[in-house]
Amino acid sequence: MRISQFEGKAVALWGWGREGRGAYRALRAQLPTQSLTMFCNAEEVRELESLADAALHVETDASAQALGRFEIVVKSPGISPYRAEALAAAAQGTQFIGGTALWFAEHAQPDGSVPGAICVTGTKGKSTTTALLAHLLRVAGHRTALVGNIGQPLLEVLAPQPPPAYWAIELSSYQTGDVGRSGARPELAVVLNLFPEHLDWHGDEARYVRDKLSLVTEGRPRIVLLNAADPLLASLQLPDSEVLWFNHPEGWHLRGDVVYRGEQAIFDSADVPLPGVHNRRNLCAVLAALEALGLDAEALAPAALSFRPLPNRLQVLGSVDGISYVNDSISTTPYASLAALACFAQRRVALLVGGHDRGLDWHDFARHMAQQAPLEIVTMAANGPRIHALLAPLADAGRFGLHAANDLEHAMQLARDALGGQGGVVLLSPGAPSFGAYSDYVARGRHFAQLAGFDPAAISAIPGLGVH
């Protein structure tokens, strides 16, 4: 559905975050006088009233009855369509649509294709992979948009001039279903990996997997690039797409630090500013994507050396009094924390874990700690006590030191004390969202930097967003 089809209909927007702001501006650009209703939080009402938009009505009660008054509701990604009020309104005939679906519908050719649209998703590594893809496309001389979940909503760049040759689009599991629902087909979709996440939004693991994979099962991209080492992905059957693989001995893969294409050694990635084996494997995904687009991936590979790492993703802030501080605030699953730990396997590490509790299972994390653990673990925040109880038997057996903190500031003090003035690494890789204590993972990362003695404002910008 295109925005022009909203004309004359009862339309509301739900959510006044960055995605909601982008949706409002996109609708107003095409429908300047149409009546719209915005459902927002009470503290956002004043900001909306300051827009002085006489055709905009503001409400704070997004009940099933209120939502059911509208033919179309443009929903922000963070609002789950599985909420009771959304399901009830949908049963009454209300159509819910996301900004991602609108963008794809606006860009679709008559045959449904969206040339140059490259969608990247996965539980871990999708932001860095998308940014690296955009970086190498630009090095190759192509005007490229770096957009989506990475921090630039698609509807904020609906019709840039001149248009980019490629769109490097990061999609979260909140957005992947929008692509299929739009009726459009991306040129290429990359799926990096799948681990349980966002279960509070999706409801259960099976639905998370289904929603995540709807990008390729319902979106029917022209080309799909999958991680051959991920069992869930390896079993997919996608008859409507050309399926390619990375992390496979016959394609682009990693041996030690060396990137191979089949049996041919291409590039030593040891000096690429991508901490962790998982990130260098995702470099293989980027090179495979470039090749799938018809570009010379082998020639472009060395340009990865000039890539600027993203903030809050295994970001080394620096050292104070012999202790290095690493900000991995983006880590919102136990698997992400394990990947972060693997980057510092030979170091004295104090790991800070815990955050908003959305019911993820930490037993695999505990099993890994029984085999290879950091020197110290500090638990904190809402799910900290649950993690602490799970790890306590291992700590009692002498596998590592275990400490319980009230908040991040307390956790950092406990970590510094536990390292005992002998140097080491304080690693913030919470394995959980920041909700409750912070507005988002960026705010958590900034607070960590501030508490460590660094300028929080200097580490927060994602380079290269938008069209360049």
UniProtKB/Swiss-Prot annotation:
Keywords: ATP-binding, Cell cycle, Cell division, Cell shape, Cell wall biogenesis/degradation, Cytoplasm, Ligase, Nucleotide-binding, Peptidoglycan synthesis. ATP binds at G122, T123, K124, G125, K126, S127, T128. Pathway: Cell wall biogenesis; peptidoglycan biosynthesis. It holds the Pfam family Mur_ligase_M. It is found in: Cytoplasm. Coiled coil: none annotated. InterPro entries: Folylpolyglutamate_synth_CS, Mur-like_cat_sf, Mur_ligase_C_dom_sf, Mur_ligase_cen, MurD, MurD2. GO terms for molecular function: ATP binding; tetrahydrofolylpolyglutamate synthase activity; UDP-N-acetylmuramoylalanine-D-glutamate ligase activity. GO terms for cellular component: cytoplasm. GO terms for biological process: cell division; cell wall organization; peptidoglycan biosynthetic process; regulation of cell shape. It is an enzyme of class 6 (ligase). Its EC number is 6.3.2.53. It comes from the Bacteria. It catalyses: UDP-N-acetyl-alpha-D-muramoyl-L-alanine + L-glutamate + ATP = UDP-N-acetyl-alpha-D-muramoyl-L-alanyl-L-glutamate + ADP + phosphate + H(+). Cell wall formation. Catalyzes the addition of L-glutamate to the nucleotide precursor UDP-N-acetylmuramoyl-L-alanine. Has weak activity with D-glutamate. Belongs to the MurCDEF family. MurD2 subfamily. The combined activity of MurD2 and MurL provides an alternative route for incorporating D-glutamate into peptidoglycan. NCBIfam families: murD. This is UDP-N-acetylmuramoyl-L-alanine--L-glutamate ligase. The gene is murD2.
